[in-house]
Each structure stands twice: as structure tokens, then as C-alpha cells.
């Protein structure tokens, strides 16, 4: 298996493209079109990390600020063929590090 990197994504259009690709591949978890579109739209303005293999996103996570001192994982997904490979843990670690950098209390 090729190396998978966790990267920060800043471009809102790229965030939308990545989240749409992955969420649409997960209909058992994100099968309601209106709700899925809301996740895609809202994550465009949030801190966003992607798991990338050979220039292709295979997972992502977005952080939502809930107060000046707290946040939560707003949405997170990993393509089914990459489940159970540790990508979710790595995305969680990136979100956690971002929360700490923003001064959120854990």
C-alpha cells in the first residue's frame, strides 16, 4: 500500500470536492441527501484535514468551533476500502492537534 499523508486543506472548493467524494461513497452513514449536502457546504469554512494517497483523498475530517474554548469533529469519513487501516485515528490526531493549537480545552 502506498504512503498515506494527512494534509491540511485550505481551499473551500477542494474541501467540498473531497467531502462530497467521500460522503457519497458512504451511503450507510450519509444516506440523506439534504444532510449530506449540509455537511459538504458547512465544512468548506472549517479547519479541514484530508488523508491523501497518490494525490487522491481517501478520508477527511472537519473541526467545528462550538464556543471560543471548545470544538468538535463536525464530520469525518474514510472510503470503505480504507476502513480499519488507522486513517481515522490519524485524522482524529490532526483534529486534536488543531484544537489544542486553537486553545480549546480537552
Model regions and ranges:
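Short amphipathic alpha-helix that is part of the acyltransferase structural core
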Residues: 1-34, 52
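A generic local structural motif
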Residues: 34-38, 94
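Short loop/turn motifs at secondary-structure junctions and domain boundaries
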Residues: 39-45
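Conserved beta-strand in the GNAT
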Residues: 50, 56-64, 71-77
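Residue-level recognition of the GNAT/N-acetyltransferase active site
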Residues: 79, 83
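Conserved acetyl-CoA-binding loop-helix of GNAT-fold acetyltransferases
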Residues: 84-97
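Conserved GNAT acetyl-CoA-binding A-motif
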Residues: 99-106
Amino acid at each position: 500500500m502506498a504512503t498515506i499523508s494527512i494534509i491540511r486543506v485550505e481551499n473551500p472548493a477542494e474541501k467540498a470536492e473531497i467531502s462530497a467524494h467521500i460522503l457519497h461513497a458512504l451511503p450507510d452513514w450519509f444516506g440523506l441527501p439534504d444532510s449530506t449536502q449540509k455537511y459538504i457546504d458547512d465544512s468548506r469554512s472549517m479547519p479541514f484535514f484530508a488523508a491523501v494517497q497518490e494525490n487522491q483523498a481517501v478520508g477527511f475530517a472537519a473541526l467545528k468551533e462550538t464556543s471560543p474554548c471548545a470544538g468538535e469533529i463536525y464530520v469525518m469519513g474514510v472510503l470503505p476500502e480504507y476502513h480499519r487501516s488507522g486513517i481515522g485515528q490519524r485524522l482524529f490526531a490532526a483534529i486534536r492537534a488543531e484544537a489544542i493549537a486553537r486553545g480549546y480545552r480537552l
